[in-house]
Swiss-Prot record:
Higher taxonomy: Archaea, Methanobacteriati, Methanobacteriota, Methanomada group, Methanobacteria
Pfam families in UniProt: SfsA (PF03749), SfsA_N (PF17746)
Transmembrane segments: none
HAMAP family: SfsA
Protein family: Belongs to the SfsA family.
Species this chain originates from: Methanothermobacter thermautotrophicus (strain ATCC 29096 / DSM 1053 / JCM 10044 / NBRC 100330 / Delta H) (Methanobacterium thermoautotrophicum)
Stated name of the protein: Sugar fermentation stimulation protein homolog
UniProt xrefs under InterPro entries: SfsA (IPR005224), SfsA_C (IPR040452), SfsA_N (IPR041465)
One function term, GO molecular function aspect: DNA binding
């Protein structure tokens, strides 16, 4: 199985609370410390007092937070919650030829400006171009992955820009990185954000590729993240 990412020197801690959107308090070696959380979602199923957390020592000494949050435990698995790794993980999937829509394309540029947004990837083949936006999905209920777990105006705007790009000759894709081994289906979370859900379905019907791909995270002396499989999309209202 292909390992997409290796993270060295992980530390274990215990979650206490979330003072603000991007900061959590944790116990490390019995002491209360602050850690930076790069996932802006609500993460209610993961941010439970006493839950195990994987951390990495911050590289800069000029921060208020000593650590970066890497992963949190959900039942018997680890869930990556650091969006700083999404671009490299997505690149490994794009370059692996595991997804039909990406075959024949190479990564031309990361962080490509389009309209009012910055899209994660511009891909190119001999005669065609594709814009790819990457979203991390951590909410998995039974075998169903749901995105988003909090309303996302930015996410809706990205999807609308991708749909508009079709009329300018681009191919467009949304790659959802689903952090959960048990997920077998993906659905936009209509209950949480009906505007995003509707925008994604409209974009898909217009020709935007919706590609959910599961990844697993194993932790021992290192953090190993590896892609598993593409899963099916189940649109709101469809029968299981």
């Amino acid at each position: 199985m292909m390992v997409a990412m290796i993270i060295e020197n992980p530390l274990r801690g215990s979650y206490i609370e979330r003072p603000n959107r991007f900061t959590v308090a944790v116990y490390v070696d019995g002491e209360r410390r602050l850690a930076h959380l790069r996932d802006p979602g609500r993460l209610r199923e993961l941010l439970i007092p006493g839950n195990d957390v994987i951390l990495r020592k911050a590289s800069s000494g000029n921060r208020k937070t000593e650590f970066d949050v890497i992963a949190l435990r959900r039942d018997d698995e680890w869930v990556l919650v650091n969006s700083g790794f999404h671009s490299d993980l997505a690149a490994s999937i794009i370059e692996s030829s595991a997804v039909d829509e990406f075959r024949g394309f190479r990564i031309e540029k990361r962080e490509c400006s389009f309209g009012r947004s910055r899209i994660d990837f511009l891909l190119a083949s001999e005669n065609e171009r594709m814009l790819v936006e990457v979203k991390g999905c951590t909410l998995v209920r039974e075998n169903l992955a749901l995105f988003p777990d909090a309303p996302t105006e930015r996410g809706r705007r990205h999807v609308e820009e991708l749909e508009r790009a079709l009329s300018e000759g681009y191919h467009s894709s949304v790659l959802f990185l689903v952090f959960g081994r048990s997920a077998r289906f993906f659905s936009p979370n209509h209950e949480m954000d009906p505007e995003f859900s509707s925008a994604l379905r409209r974009a898909h019907e217009a020709g935007v590729n919706v590609i959910p791909y599961t990844l697993a995270t194993d932790i021992n002396e290192k953090v190993l993240v590896y892609p598993l499989r593409r899963i099916a999309v189940r649109w709101p209202g469809e029968s299981p």
